[in-house]
Amino acid sequence: MATEVSQLLLAVVQGIPAGATNDDLTKALPDVPAATRVEALNILLQEGGIEILKKGEKLVYRAKDPEKKSALPKDADNEEKVVYGIVEEGGNKGIWIRDIRMKSNLNMIQLNKILKNLETKKLIKAVKSVNASKKKVYMLYNLEPDLSITGGAWYQDQDFEVEFVDVLNQQCLRFLQMKRDSAEKKREGPLAFKQMSCCTVNEVQKFISDLGISKVNLAEADLETILKTVVYDGNAERVRQQDGSFVYRAVNAPLPPTGLVQMPCGICPVIKNCSNCGDVTAITCEYMRDWLD
C-alpha cells in the first residue's frame, strides 16, 4: 500500500516545482491516511526521489533530479537533509550560518550540532571568506570555492600577498622590456618594431611558468591582471588587435614634469595679472603658501 502511495505522492510533488507542503499532499490524496502518507514519504526520501526543505514553519517536499545523486546517507534525519539541501543551494559561493538558520528555522545549538556532524562526515566544509575573515561560509565538501571567496592566487590564508604581486609585476615588466630590446636590435622600421615588441598574455604566462617563481598555477586571467597593473604604472601599453584580443608592450617611462608645472604658477589662470604688488601677488598667494608647506 505505502509503495503504491509513494508513486502517487511523487507524481504530485513533481507537479509542484517549488515544492509541495503537507496541505498540498492532503488535498491531492484526501483518501490516503496520514500514517500511510508519512510512510510513503519516508520511502521516497530513502530512495532519493524527493528532498525535504523547510520554508518558514512548514516542511516542503521537492522532486529531485534523477541524474543528480546526493552524497547524503540514507540514514540521515530530516533536519540534516534540510540543512544539507540549503548548503547545496549555496553552490561554490557558500552560505552564511545566519542564512542557514533563517532558512531552516532551527535554533543555533541544534544547527551547530548538525553542521558539526555534516563536517565530520565530510559532506560539507567551512571556508573563510577574504571579504570577512571572521566569518565562515558553508558549502559541499567536494566543491572548489569561488574566487570571490578565496581571493584567487593573490591571497594566502586570507592575507593579500603583496610581495608576490610585486615580484610578478617586476618579472612581467622585465619580459616586456626584453621583448622590446630584442625588437630594437633588429632595426626593421617603426611598424615592424611595434609589432615585434608586443606580447600576448599566453607568452607572458609561459615565461612566468618557466621561471618557477609561483607555487600556484597562474591562469591567463591572473597574469592579465598583473599586466594591467604594469599599464597603470605607466610602464606598458595595452593594444587591441583586430580580432578583439589584447597584447602588451613596454614603453619608455614618461619624462618627469618640469618645476614650472609642479608649482602653482604653472597652472594659475591669472598669472598675467601677478606682480610684486596689488591683489594678485605671490607674497599673499594661499596656493603658493600651501605648496611651500
UniProtKB/Swiss-Prot annotation:
Keywords: DNA-directed RNA polymerase, Nucleus, Transcription
Subcellular location: Nucleus
GO CC term, one of those recorded: RNA polymerase III complex
A Pfam family of this chain: RNA_pol_Rpc34
Cysteine disulfide links: none
Keyword Transcription set for record: yes
Gene Ontology BP terms: transcription by RNA polymerase III
Family stated for the protein in its record: Belongs to the eukaryotic RPC34/RPC39 RNA polymerase subunit family.
Function description: DNA-dependent RNA polymerase catalyzes the transcription of DNA into RNA using the four ribonucleoside triphosphates as substrates. Specific peripheric component of RNA polymerase III which synthesizes small RNAs, such as 5S rRNA and tRNAs.
Quaternary structure note: Component of the RNA polymerase III (Pol III) complex consisting of 17 subunits.
Protein name: DNA-directed RNA polymerase III subunit RPC6
Lineage of the organism: Eukaryota, Metazoa, Ecdysozoa, Arthropoda, Hexapoda
